Design a protein with these regions (language model features):
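Charged, alpha-helix-forming regions
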Residues: 2-292
Length: 292
């Protein structure tokens, strides 16, 4: 190969490389910009996600700023000790027990416009936040009739959640389940037995006219549940509920701590792993539930 041929081949290779680089640059220019890195590394090397940072900021605000009037929330004392299921339950009944407290939830029927429809057992974040908001209004205003907003979007906002199609579906499903559920709450010889919700107009859409589903607007608590709630309400902080809304387990741990710390006087209390497992891990089953 002559010198001239070698130079020509080298120029061709350089041209191919430049062409490849140009093509790659054009492809990258057409792609959306990379997402902003939301992770943060602390001086000790701990990696914090964006959610971790928000939780730390919320906890700092709660620790340094006393709750205002709108920050105060309430829930039933027994539900602080034994909450609703955190994941979907197969079947029509759910039982949870911890120490002297226990809860039994039974699925019920709700008329959705064309006769009775069996509802699932309420589970997850949505019924926890919904029940806390309803209980808060009842305790603050000494009222059994609870206004739950003029729309589903407003009720989601009241619970500190953004409104989107997926949340609308979850809200409808879980509010129907909660309204239909039969609840038994027991503690040291006393049992509440009934339905927390006495009346709830189902969130029904008119499929024939394609109208948007009508939001019921009002929920009526049963007299027995209302009386039990007023007698044993536990104060919570709405800011904490909103910060922890991404996890049913986190909400359960917070409500449990709020209830326990509210009662502790003088000497501290030693908590053993066995009691914590009984409190929060009854739903973990399988080959190695302790590890899970």
């Amino acid at each position: 190969m002559t010198k001239k041929q070698r130079e020509g081949q080298g120029a061709q290779q350089i041209g191919e490389i430049m062409g490849d680089l140009l093509a790659q640059a054009q492809i990258k220019a057409a792609l959306p910009p990379p997402k902003r890195q939301t992770k943060k590394i602390t001086p000790t090397g701990l990696i914090l996600t964006e959610r971790d940072q928000k939780l730390i900021e919320a906890s700092a605000e709660i620790a340094t700023t006393p709750p205002g009037g709108e920050d105060m929330a309430f829930t039933h004392a027994v539900l602080c000790q034994v909450g609703l299921p955190r994941a979907k339950v197969e079947g029509r009944e759910f039982m949870r027990q911890s120490g002297a407290a226990w809860v039994n939830v039974q699925a019920g029927y709700l008329d959705e416009g064309h006769g009775p429809v069996l509802q699932p057992i309420p589970y997850g974040v949505m019924p926890r936040l919904g029940l806390a908001w309803v209980s808060t209004f009842a305790v603050r205003n000494k009222e059994r009739e609870i206004p739950i907003g003029d729309s589903a979007a407003e009720f989601l906002r009241l619970m500190g959640m953004e409104s989107d199609g997926r949340r609308y579906t979850t809200l409808r499903k879980q509010m129907h389940a909660l309204a239909a559920a039969r609840l038994q709450l027991g503690f040291k010889g006393r049992t509440y037995n009934g339905q927390p919700v006495q009346q709830f107009d189902a969130w029904v859409a008119n499929k024939d006219t394609q109208q948007r589903a009508l939001w019921p607007g009002v929920m009526l608590l049963s007299e027995d549940y209302y009386g039990s709630l007023i007698e044993s309400a536990v104060p919570l902080d709405n800011r904490a509920l909103h910060a922890l809304k991404g996890s049913a387990l986190a909400l359960d741990v917070y409500a449990w701590l709020a209830h326990r710390l509210h009662r502790i006087e003088g000497r501290g209390v030693t908590l053993h792993w066995k009691s914590l497992r009984e409190q929060f891990a009854q739903e973990y089953k399988g080959k190695d539930p302790d590890k899970d």
